[in-house]
Amino acid sequence: MAAAPDRQKALDAALAQIDKQFGKGSVMRLGDEVRAPIEVIPTGSIALDVALGIGGLPRGRVVEIYGPESSGKTTVALHAVANAQRQGGIAAFIDAEHALDPEYAAKLGVDTDALLVSQPDTGEQALEIMDMLIGSGSLDVIVIDSVAALVPRAEIEGDMGDSHVGLQARLMSQALRKITGRLSQTKTTAIFINQLREKIGVFFGSPETTTGGKALKFYASIRIDVRRIQTLKEGADSVGNRTKAKIVKNKMAPPFKIAEFDIIYGQGISREGGIIDMGVEHGLIKKSGSWFTYDGDQLGQGMENSRRFLRDNPELAAELERLIKEKLGVGVKPAEAEKEASPKLKAVDGF
């Protein structure tokens, strides 16, 4: 074995050659610099941000949101888009289903005038557009809605009844191999919305599976299973859904956490309702009968009145949200974010 000084000289020479050929920082020691905090995009639900363990969806990673129809998948994705735009970011939406409702998106806070939208004809076209947008280095978040609608060109141009086994899975595998590195380099979050299917002949375990093969399961840093569990009513009228999100996979924090939040028809995720739920759960908000109080002041009688009070007092809502996240140790502290994160990619707790 070579002497230690000789080995170190050989390593230094190799590192110098790598830096010269591939650019400075191509290889680094983990201890060389203090690592910047994980940069995130808030989801719009404080319960989901806490369940994710880092305060939102991580930048530079692949995220999969899946579940049954009308469970709130696109709503969660659009809230992430709106929050990225509030941070000054640029967002794109690949509408493979041709079903994006601009009016609904605007109600959720999305700047539809600035949102980049594509309605591709084939899966190849959709993924090529996505690859080019990510490669520009200008995007903060891109949503693909949905994986199931990424139909390969051969299937579209073929006849009904033709067999195209594995085409979509191969397409997804190739695309993810190409984009994963670029996402990390450009700090772009890619959100894939996916649908559920049932496997035939499964007698043990869940028969449910997602479309597009196994590649997305492997490449995704976070997978969120979104389900509608209850209909919210005011009198006889249905006003929204109670939604449960399970973090099925999480490379950034412990997985399998569960979050519940309300989605109000025409308004999206009830941020204020989530703050009240989490505040009560962690002792910041007191509930006595139907009354909710914070620091001796009454928020309102009943959930709807308390929601409305927080909506009319955004400073109080932001303070409660900050206190909840601080108590649970979730999100980036402002001083750390200012010191270590770049202005464009700075994590934001409030929105």
Swiss-Prot record:
Protein name, as recorded: Protein RecA
Signal peptide: none
Taxonomic classification: Bacteria, Bacillati, Actinomycetota, Actinomycetes, Micrococcales
Function: Can catalyze the hydrolysis of ATP in the presence of single-stranded DNA, the ATP-dependent uptake of single-stranded DNA by duplex DNA, and the ATP-dependent hybridization of homologous single-stranded DNAs. It interacts with LexA causing its activation and leading to its autocatalytic cleavage.
Family listed: Belongs to the RecA family.
Record keywords: ATP-binding, Cytoplasm, DNA damage, DNA recombination, DNA repair, DNA-binding, Nucleotide-binding, SOS response
InterPro entries: AAA+_ATPase (IPR003593), DNA_recomb/repair_RecA (IPR013765), DNA_recomb/repair_RecA_CS (IPR020584), P-loop_NTPase (IPR027417), RecA-like_C (IPR049261), RecA-like_N (IPR049428), RecA_ATP-bd (IPR020588), RecA_C_sf (IPR023400)
Pfam family, one: RecA
UniProt GO BP: DNA recombination; DNA repair; SOS response
Localization per Swiss-Prot or TrEMBL: Cytoplasm
CDD domains: RecA
Domain of life: Bacteria
Molecular function terms from GO: ATP binding; ATP hydrolysis activity; ATP-dependent DNA damage sensor activity; damaged DNA binding; single-stranded DNA binding
Keyword Nucleotide-binding set for record: yes
Organism: Arthrobacter sp. (strain FB24)
Gene transcribed to yield this protein: recA
HAMAP family xrefs: RecA (MF_00268)
GO cellular component: cytosol
Keyword DNA damage applies: yes
Sequence positions that bind ATP: G67, P68, E69, S70, S71, G72, K73, T74
Disulfide bridges in this chain: none
SMART domains: AAA
